[in-house]
Amino acid sequence: MGVAPLEDFNQQRPTEGGVPSERTQVFIRYDNDALYLGARMFRAQPSDILRSLSRRDGSATAEHLQVTFDTHRDGRTGYAFKISAAGVQGDFHHAQDNEMRGREAQYDPVWEASAAIDSLGWVAEMRIPFSQLRFPAADRQEWGFQLDRWMPDKNEDLQWIVIPTKETGYISRFGTLTGIAGVKAVRPVELLPYVASDAVRAAVVDQANPFRNPTRTRVGMDAKFGIGSNLTIDATMNPDFGQVEADPAEVNLSAFETIVEERRTFFTEGAQLLRIEGPNYFYSRRIGAAPHLSVSGDYVDQPRASTILGAAKLTGRTASRLSVGALLGMTGRANARVFSVDSNRTTSTVVEPRTEYAVVRLEQELGKQASTFGGMLVAMRRDLGSYPTLTARLASQAYSGGVDWRIRWQQGKYAVSGYAGFSHVEGDSLAIGRVQRSSAHYFQRPDGAYLDYDPSRQSLTGYTASIRADKDAGRRILWGAQVSTETSGYEVNDVGRLQSAEDVDYNADIQIRETEPGRYLRNWRLGFVSRGSFNYGGNHTNAEWQQSANLTFLNFWSLNLNTRLDPSTLDDALTRGGPLMRTGLSWGQDYRLNSAMGARTGWRANYNWGRDALGGWRSAFGGGITVRPSPRWQLSLDPNYQRSTDSRQYVTTVTDAAATATYGARYLFAYVDRVTTSLKTRVNYAFSRSLTLEGYAEPFAASGRYHGIGELRAPRTSELRRYGAEGTTITRLADGSYAVTPQGAAFTLSNRDFNVLSFRSNVVLRWEWHAGSTLYVVWQQNRRASEALGEPVSAADLLNTTRAAGDNFLALKMSYWLPVKGRS
């Protein structure tokens, strides 16, 4: 390569193709071991450079330079490296031809970089070893190549090759890097052994508890092996995730599980190659989740999570444009220990069986338009042994998978995509009966005879399919339309995620946009969406109409306005296994205002409200502010406060032959007045680029008061017969429960009012003490208190969360990177 620097940059933002406000020069060199990049970023006022110091991959709010290589020249995958003006490194891997979607920040190669600010602006140097890149074996390399400089104080994004914002594609539009010759492709072998120790300290210690204050020490290892120039095996043995941030608190009154984000690095890295657009065949949080069973006794040592004995995955993309993702994992049998005071004995009970998982995903790219055809297969097997409590609860085997496709033309402007898949679960009739009665199916619905509920069934098979058409590019109008379905027997919740089967879903959307700056706005977008569902009985079970407006002002502030209308439909899940019930017409709006993305002090504010025709309502305030008082400090506060009344909250089902109008059962509902408030807080301090202290805390308070209890008057209606009228009685007892006398057998309802306080925090000292090697010191708190009061909580209760009883978790983990010379 010549001596002349690369400096012909142009704006992508704020004005596509515009002249840069500042000059940039980049030089590239290489030797047998590494590629070197030197850069000069000019600034007329160097004091304006944002240079916040943070941990690795945390430089989004600082001015930075990024280089991305498409080493296989496939127009789809890429390796990105960036350096901020403060010298903070960042890196990620692109698994798709998209700047943001499919970008994996968990990609952490070992490379070197430095930066310095001077009177002309700032300079940067990078050294990227060829061992950290995968590229084909060839005498002369030809790579896709892109440079990007981000100046947040100006909201200005400069690119060497300007990527059009009105069209699809990112990596496929890169320029070309040539001139690298005589470099050998290396198949890396990297080992990362670790040692960790942790201890739990309860706030209130019962000295008679033999399981008090447990302490553990363990060792494990991660490993990475290169296969050829395209594929990589990652393996982990006895992994430790003690440094991972805790999940947020909530009070879930629905019939459906809460889906939480995956934060464990082994499962997030390469995750894009283990999923498809559409069916959630694989939900990695299933591996190593909390045991399905629990035990009771005088003193109990209940495992918080199943132990992952080991896992391995194969990821990459071959020269023939075949993307490969495969994962194998095994969790060990989990035992809970119970100590009996009377017998002075400790017994052990199996609460989770040994379980094996397998996931395979292949996707072949076809033709010049980058159309794709792929397939996926997921399998799970549990060793239930001779444990009747396990066989009655859990399926022994589960399989799912299918094929998917995306046909593109006019360079991705138009596309038709779809999928077709299956599921199959096997197990004891009691376990399969639980699946049939679960919230995803409700086979037992008395008005759903076509569902064929069979309590003797020992397996369940179902299918899913979808077809979608999209216009993904163009200056002014984008649109999409989709129809999808899941049959009643479709079930993937052993390894994947499914909220509801037996649906025919439809979705149509159109967007009208302007990406060029105007007199008052930099850009704007209007969207209209209609979506909904029918079940296989022909009932319209869900409907939603939504209109949105997204505006970006000349000062880079943005305003989002959303209006939603949900027509009345017949819901097949509200009665939780009972007959269809009509929902009320509901409507609402959401307003969001955000500061400029590159502001030194960033903020956002939002308000949303909703109403329904049955007397329900919602009003919620939220927001956030991020303050950087100095380059080393960062403080973020995200307050939220919501008041609502749910007009049809399910309470319980009471069997009563006298309730002939509702198939011999009474389906009870109530109004619930709810208040929820929380304050997510983050405080980060960077001692240096390699030594950081990060703190996270979330005080959370919630309350709920049930009133207006009644029973569904008739199927396919929303009408309730309120207790205390029409010849019925309801009496509040001294313990808070209710004695109810309907027009039939009397019964008692427990007190469901609640006040919940929760405080979860996570403080992590992270020191990258050697290249690729890290020391973590972690302190976590998990405090919780609950009472059956139903008194509205307020912001003052957030202080009370810190005084609730709970546990302190202390952990120390040290890893050491051991590169083994790979073969070429």
Language-model regions, residue ranges each:
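Surface-exposed extracellular loop regions of Gram-negative outer-membrane beta-barrel proteins
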Residues: A185-D234, V360-L451, D509, E516, ...
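Structural preference for beta-rich elements and adjacent junctions enriched in aromatics
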Residues: M1-E365, S371-G375, L384-Y387, A804
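Alpha-helix capping and helix-loop boundary segments enriched in small/acidic/polar residues
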Residues: P210-F211, S254, Q302, T346-P353, ...
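Exposed, low-structure sequence patches enriched in small/polar residues
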Residues: T307, T315, A415-S417, G421-S824
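Generic structural hydrophobic/aromatic packing signal, biased to beta-strands
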Residues: V26-I28, L37-A39, L65-F69, F81-I83, ...
